[in-house]
Swiss-Prot record:
<keyword id="KW-0832">Ubl conjugation</keyword>
<feature type="compositionally biased region" description="Basic and acidic residues">
    <location>
        <begin position="163"/>
        <end position="185"/>
    </location>
</feature>
<keyword id="KW-0413">Isomerase</keyword>
<keyword id="KW-0547">Nucleotide-binding</keyword>
<feature type="short sequence motif" description="Nuclear localization signal">
    <location>
        <begin position="83"/>
        <end position="85"/>
    </location>
</feature>
<dbReference type="InterPro" id="IPR037102">
    <property type="entry name" value="Znf_lg_T-Ag_D1_dom_sf"/>
</dbReference>
<dbReference type="InterPro" id="IPR014000">
    <property type="entry name" value="PPV_DNA_helicase_E1_N"/>
</dbReference>
<keyword id="KW-0597">Phosphoprotein</keyword>
<feature type="modified residue" description="Phosphoserine; by host">
    <location>
        <position position="89"/>
    </location>
</feature>
<dbReference type="GO" id="GO:0006260">
    <property type="term" value="P:DNA replication"/>
</dbReference>
<keyword id="KW-1017">Isopeptide bond</keyword>
<dbReference type="GO" id="GO:0003678">
    <property type="term" value="F:DNA helicase activity"/>
</dbReference>
<feature type="modified residue" description="Phosphoserine; by host">
    <location>
        <position position="107"/>
    </location>
</feature>
<dbReference type="InterPro" id="IPR016393">
    <property type="entry name" value="Rep_E1_papillomaV"/>
</dbReference>
<dbReference type="InterPro" id="IPR001177">
    <property type="entry name" value="PPV_DNA_helicase_E1_C"/>
</dbReference>
<dbReference type="GO" id="GO:0005524">
    <property type="term" value="F:ATP binding"/>
</dbReference>
<comment type="similarity">
    <text>Belongs to the papillomaviridae E1 protein family.</text>
</comment>
Amino acid sequence: MADDTGTDNEGTGCSGWFLVEAIVDKTTGEQVSDDEDETVEDSGLDMVDFIDDRPITHNSLEAQALLNEQEADAHYAAVQDLKRKYLGSPYVSPLGHIEQSVDCDISPRLDAIQLSRKPKKVKRRLFQSREITDSGYGYSEVETATQVERYGEPENGCGGGGDGREKEGEGQVHTEVHTESEIEQHTGTTRVLELLKCKDVRATLHGKFKECYGLSFKDLTREFKSDKTTCGDWVVAGFGVHHSVSEAFQKLIQPLSTYSHIQWLTNYKCMGMVLLVLLRFKVNKNRCTVARTLATLLNIPEDHMLIEPPKIQSSVAALYWFRTSISNASIVTGDTPEWIARQTIVEHGLADNQFKLTEMVQWAYDNDYCDESDIAFEYAQRADFDSNAKAFLNSNCQAKYVKDCATMCKHYKNAEMKKMSIKQWIKYRSNKIDETGNWKPIVQFLRHQGIEFISFLSKLKLWLHGTPKKNCIAIVGPPDTGKSAFCMSLIKFLGGTVISYVNSSSHFWLQPLCNAKVALLDDATQSCWGYMDTYMRNLLDGNPMSIDRKHKSLALIKCPPLLVTSNIDITTEERYKYLYSRVTLFKFPNPFPFDSNGNAVYELCDANWKCFFARLSASLDIQDSEDEDDGDTSQAFRCVPGTVVRTV
């Protein structure tokens, strides 16, 4: 039994501390043990067998492995107990993630029986960078409702229930909390890497741009859906540009553009330099070409740029570029684009208020536009420099204006044509052709077909002047002899019209003859000749005839000179004997010649017909009189009202 000498009744009779000395049974001079010899010097011989270096058997290896495994489990359990001791709550983990905290720190059984478990918060990963994390366990995540911790104590009270818990958790996860000031200390390279790791880089760049410049990028640009659509003006926003590149960008872009408006924003939240530039290239480019060009000049990836065409119809966007161009924050080279000047100069703004139909009609008349589609398309393209065209585009009655313009232009053209004689008309058509051709190919082609030129010239003279009984010329012959090519080239030069018997079921098929100087009926068949023999004898005579017009009253007209092509020779058939005296017939028996390259040997073009009529004007009785040798003294047509000057 152990010795009971000691302090068993400590603290029962008094309050406080007192010293107790240990009792030693051995006295000086006594031998400690019988088996110990103090006279023997310590030579270390007793430590010879301290290390067991005997060969290890197979059973010993298994026992040693088991011992190592048990020791490792014990060490791991001790570390886990230490971690649990210093955790303020199962929902607060050094990892900073609720999911990992619950999975790693709480046992599965305890997690299964928990009754009041807090819902998991929705998280949104922003920038994944290992440089931000301290321990390297994972990437930082920012919660939608961020839990802010100060001095190791969460604001929502999840730090534990006891004082000991709070004291033990004072120094825990504050090293994982990164404030905004700490994140802003990262380099520009880190910011660029963060952009690359974003799920939607384009949306991030739009947000960065609005933070930098205080307005949305879409306020200045319109959107092109396709990357292949070309445009001359482009707005580009670039992020993460190095300062050395920014200094030389102005000179690098000059050979490619005629106008540049450059704005630099330096060191915005360590994002590097941010570029906003409006460029007008020398040639139109698409978005892909602009991206490759500027990525090379700025030395940044293509997905770090926003590239869209500017809003040329927005006065707000034009005012922004104008105001920034006169400030010291921009570098501007070249002439200001017309769409900016048009919307920022007072005179242009006053002129854009109202649309004048007379100016549109005058433009269509001067440029020979009578088709509604041509008028609408061509006049809309003038909106960049014509204030009246811009007002036309801003109007809600564009279709009505186009229809009215085409109608008025046709009326003016028809009245002008009816007022001219055939001599004046040929001169008018010749003045529209700038080239000087050769009349000989036409004569050579007629000789190739076996037609006597003098006879053809005399009958052509009667046909041009609309002589009765000589008002119709028919050219007949086998296929591929050049009948249609010859007549079509002549009608094109004279500005005539073409009628088709295919519409004979409608009695309006002759209506184009009302507004024509000459006409052509191509490829007349047996039924067509029968119709002409039955209903059109008076028309072939060149006498006045009543023509029915659609949605209009009957018109009394004199048939214009008429050309007819056909494969049928009416002079060989008895039933067309009443047309013999009304139709002048020429035969084309020979095929139309072509060279080895497939080109026509005899060129029948407008320039050659112009030279033909100018050369043979005397023979055709269309030469200018002596009074007209000095030029046309008539005033040009003008439908725009002039300014009346009133004297005082």
